[in-house]
Amino acid sequence: GRGYDPEFLTALGETEESLSAQIAEENVQALCNLLIIEFPTDEIRGEAAGLLEELYAKADYTVGAAVPPGNGSEVEITVRPVDALARVNDALWERLDAFNAGYTGDTSTDEGYAAYDAAWAEDALALFREKLAEAEYLSETVCTVTVLDGPGGTIEAGRDSLDTVYGVLFPIWMLQET
């Protein structure tokens, strides 16, 4: 588990398991949004969750020793980013254009559009699978995370610094100047 603060869980009225499940579902939805899948079925969500697990398994990082700077500790995390999401983003629109050019189904009804979206979802997930297999590691980056003592002997890290580590591990795309 993530080691959530018990007071935080109580305030939310959640258990660690239910909160972790919600976060996992939000990550699946974020992947579906990235892949432009509008109406993911349970099957598509399950496949997306499995692909995210594969992506997370590629995470490569080393956590250094804590250095006490006063009211807490700073921990350096050396991260080797994986470029899978950037590769997906780079290929997505071309893949969608090719899919649309070859799609012959009727999208004028709700049922027809749902069939289109399901077919696109399979193609988009296949693209993700392809790019995940091709993914390479980028140059190492060092991130510093401030860790504080939490209640009950737990430790806490600021959400912003953890988001920075996550963003470095899995860069989605670089904004291009126009």
Regions inferred by a protein language model and the residue ranges of each:
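Core segments of small alpha/beta cavity-forming domains
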Residues: 1-58
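Mixed-charge, low-complexity intrinsically disordered segments
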Residues: 20-23, 27-35, 85-139
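Residue-level signal for tight coil/turn positions that link beta-strands
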Residues: 68-72, 151
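Beta-strand elements of well-folded, non-transmembrane domains
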Residues: 79-85, 149-151
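Short beta-strand edge/turn micro-motifs at domain boundaries
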Residues: 97-107, 111, 115, 133-178
